[in-house]
């Protein structure tokens, strides 16, 4: 089955709202083994929407739309879809009562505009919306399937999970399961090279690498006539990949790197403090986003100037004068200094040149040092990156977390 995702709303075209719906639906369809061929965003215009539907159904079996189901005159998705399928819109009494009941919860009465939301194509399956006043619907005609969903993610996602996924699973006549492995420390091209035999000889399951800033994900997808069989097909491929990539795999599913590191610290009761220069608190921010980290995260210091490194972290003045602030020697003294000052098992530091200015021939933009102190033992990691200031700072945080993780394994 081939699919297109069509997101409707002038606010999306203007950039007022980020289109997270397409990303979410694509991931869910990929989990089901449904190929997404195209994403489209279109304004609230009936003529353009009709043309997009005609174009999409020229090569797709399934079109999923989000948005344009509201009560205002420019919410035209329902009308456009009905016209495309040559269906009349009729009032659905049950939906009308549900909308009226929901409005009453907010001390609002039914208006003619709201009543519009209770009209649907005559031959469709209506999708109830317990989180809003815009029900969705599914219409199937002439081997074409349109799934029409509301725009707000808090309305769309539950509807997709509870109604659309079961509907689509019945159409596929098979069970599709996926397992996502999360990798950091090596790039997508290196991952692809290391598992090239698997990628070149894949059938069922399939293995697909995806890159994002600082990490790579591998999605293993298997299709079978039962969930148990599909999961059993994934096991040997996952085992082989883990043997090849080893500790570069930090987790699976939706697990984040900071969550993995925080769990390691909490489970082992290892206290930690951070000393940051170029990352300016980003590393501490990542760690404290994890619930329960307060039991082990004692302190975070932003020591941007040389004076603060000396006064706060006890970095030696002569070390700074001899090696400069961007050096492995200073990174190590920063990590040890914050650990001893805070009385923690672990101290971790970042120092570097994030740019866009400040680089020299010996200390170019993108040169980063990460210092680590763990119960008396110290180590340091040197990094070299190019890119924007924000990219360099963010990638430094990812590498620092991974450096800590690998030293705790």
Curated annotation (Swiss-Prot):
Pfam families assigned: CinA (PF02464), CinA_KH (PF18146), MoCF_biosynth (PF00994)
Entries under Gene3D superfamilies matching the protein: 3.30.70.2860, CinA-like, MoaB/Mog-like domain
Superkingdom of origin organism: Bacteria
HAMAP family the record matches: CinA_B
UniProt xrefs under PANTHER family: NICOTINAMIDE-NUCLEOTIDE AMIDOHYDROLASE PNCC, NMN AMIDOHYDROLASE-LIKE PROTEIN YFAY
Family to which this protein belongs: Belongs to the CinA family.
Name by which UniProt lists this protein: Putative competence-damage inducible protein
């Amino acid at each position: 089955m081939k699919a297109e995702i069509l997101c409707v709303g002038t606010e999306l075209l203007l950039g007022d709202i980020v289109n997270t719906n397409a990303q979410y639906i694509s991931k869910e369809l990929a989990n089901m083994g449904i190929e997404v061929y195209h994403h489209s965003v279109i304004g609230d215009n009936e003529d353009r929407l009709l043309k997009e539907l005609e174009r999409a159904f020229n090569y797709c079996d399934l079109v999923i739309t989000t948005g344009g189901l509201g009560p205002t005159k420019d919410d035209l998705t329902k009308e456009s879809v009905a016209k495309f399928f040559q269906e009349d819109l009729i009032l659905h009494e049950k939906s009308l009562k549900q909308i009226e009941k929901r409005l009453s919860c907010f001390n609002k009465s039914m208006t003619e505009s709201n009543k519009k939301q209770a009209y649907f194509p005559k031959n469709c399956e209506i999708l109830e919306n317990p989180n809003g006043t815009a029900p969705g619907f599914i219409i199937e005609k002439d081997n074409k399937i349109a799934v029409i969903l509301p725009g707000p993610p808090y309305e769309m996602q539950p509807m997709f999970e509870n109604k659309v996924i079961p509907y689509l699973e019945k159409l596929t006549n098979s069970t599709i399961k996926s397992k996502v492995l999360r990798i950091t420390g090596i790039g997508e091209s290196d991952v692809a090279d290391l598992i090239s035999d698997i990628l070149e000889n894949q059938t069922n399951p399939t293995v697909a690498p995806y890159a994002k800033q600082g990490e790579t994900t591998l999605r293993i997808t298997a299709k079978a006539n039962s969930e148990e069989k599909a999961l059993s097909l994934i096991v040997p491929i996952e085992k082989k990949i883990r043997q090849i990539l080893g500790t570069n795999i930090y987790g699976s599913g939706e697990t984040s790197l900071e969550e993995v590191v925080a769990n390691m610290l909490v489970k082992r009761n290892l206290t930690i403090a951070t000393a940051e220069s170029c990352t300016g608190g980003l590393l501490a921010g990542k760690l404290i986003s994890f619930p329960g980290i307060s039991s082990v995260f004692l302190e975070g210091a932003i020591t941007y100037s040389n004076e603060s490194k000396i006064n706060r972290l006890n970095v030696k003045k002569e070390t700074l004068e001899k090696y400069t602030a961007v050096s492995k020697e200073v990174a190590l003294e920063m990590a040890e200094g914050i650990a001893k000052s805070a009385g923690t098992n672990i101290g971790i530091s970042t120092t570097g040149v994030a740019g866009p200015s400040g680089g020299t021939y010996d200390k170019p933009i993108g040169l980063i040092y990460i210092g680590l102190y763990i119960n008396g033992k110290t180590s340091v990691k040197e990094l070299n990156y190019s890119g924007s200031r924000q990219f360099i700072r963010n990638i430094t945080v990812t590498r620092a977390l991974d450096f800590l993780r690998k030293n705790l394994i």
